[in-house]
Amino acid sequence: MQNDSGIRSLLTQPWIYNAYQNIVGATRARQRVSNRFWRAQPGQRVVDIGCGPGNLVRHLPAGVKYVGFDVSEEYIGHARRSFEGDPDKTFIVGSAENFIADLPGPMRNADLVVMGGLLHHLDDGEALTALRLARAALAPHGHLVALEGTFLVRQSMLSRWFVGLDRGRNVRSEPEWKELTGKVFDHFETFTLTGLDRTPYTYIVIEASLQPRSHAQPQIG
């Protein structure tokens, strides 16, 4: 669930949402996460769960086979117009619940599954469904990268206040994110990040896979 009351309702409009994202530095943040965690390569399959207006596409290399879906018809309509003419980009209206029982072919064997700020809009049951869909979509060698807001045990009052302003009503603590992810994935790591954009927001990156992965600690730059 999310809070779209009052001024937050404006963010349901794609152009206002994108303008806000640019103001807070979300474009730079996505690029930094792409460089360090997504590591997508041309020709790979990417599934974007809760894709919004399709902003993540701009941070993927050319030639990626991309499928994104979202419950918002307004966001999907905007995404389709933005990437019209690119046969490698597909946008679908729907939720994880719509696809979990019968995964469409284009969503299978993904090298990368991305969730950019989706899970904190979902209750535990809905979030588990999204994580299970991500697991089902992954190729054996693939990996999931989810970027979310988080509460920390040691966190500045300003950061905690700012995270609490989020439209999503299910921002979780770091231990809660780990517990949730561990119900679906045996192999995952989490990384907390600050200074990713122009706000005091605290992020957590959840990187999960079907098989153990080994790489160095993230250097965000």
Language-model features: where?
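Class I (Rossmann-like) S-adenosyl-L-methionine-dependent methyltransferase catalytic domain
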Residues: 1-43, 47, 52-103, 122-126, ...
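Hydrophobic adenine-recognition pocket in adenosine-nucleotide-binding enzymes
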Residues: 118
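Alpha-helix termini
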Residues: 102-107, 138
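A conserved beta-strand element that flanks and buttresses the S-adenosyl-L-methionine
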Residues: 114
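Local beta-strand N-terminus motif with an aromatic residue
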Residues: 43, 109-110
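Glycine-centered flexibility motif
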Residues: 67, 108-109
